[in-house]
Amino acid sequence: VQITGDFLPTQKMQTPYGEFDAPGVADLIEKDGVWEFTTPEPLAPELYSYTMLVDGLKINDPSNVHRIRDVQSVSDVFIIPGERADLYSINDVPHGTVSKIWYNSPTLGMDRRLTVYTPAGYETSGKRYPVFYLLHGMGGDENAWTELGRASQILDNLIARGEAEPMIVVMTNGNAALQAAPGESSLGFTAPSMALPKTMEGSFETHFPEVVKFIDKNYRTIKNKKSRAIAGLSMGGFHSIHISKQYPDMFDYVGLFS
């Protein structure tokens, strides 16, 4: 019985495409019916993920119900508190609201699902807010930033610290052939996949003004370029740069995370 996780040193692996760093693996020790692993040194504050290997078969830790999904990979997680890791935790601060909303896209010919974060106090403040459009990477969906990336916890904590301005954050589904994340549309419990059609051929970028129009109509936004930002991870960065290029009057801030 072994454990593999991002708190272990990586190991070099040879492949037909060259050498790369593979996740580290360590043996678990059985003691009184409990399998244990002790790190050589205390772990630094951070959010860590791991899985277990039983005779080479990957399984999740049956004693840990806290898990994240990254495309088809499901891992157990834990947080060592302190420093940056406190941003990922639910702390005693005002909390925003996360909503799953459907909008119609004539360009893509379907109703589509997105995630919207509104900051603490939005419901009663009467204020208008800037909007940050946050796009996921390849294989992700509209759930990725909140479920995998803990975006709502990070935003709550940054805003409470005064390190971020209260804002609306919109997290779309960048897979233009799909309505929503696996299990969240009429397709049923489909398997997540990296190999989806219409992810980077321009359809998602072309339809994006429909998202902005929907958000401006249904939320108290500041409806101008200088109050909008767009950024994304990996494929989301690709989408961000091309959306900002295709619609230069839409966003004053553009970020590429990789």
What are these model-predicted stretches?
Residues 3, 46-54, 116, 129, ...:
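Short beta-strand segments enriched for Tyr within beta-sheet-rich domains
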Residues 150-153, 210, 217, 222-258:
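Primarily recognizes the serine-hydrolase "nucleophile elbow" in alpha/beta-hydrolase
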Residues 1-45, 55-81:
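Aromatic-rich carbohydrate-binding modules that target alpha-glucans
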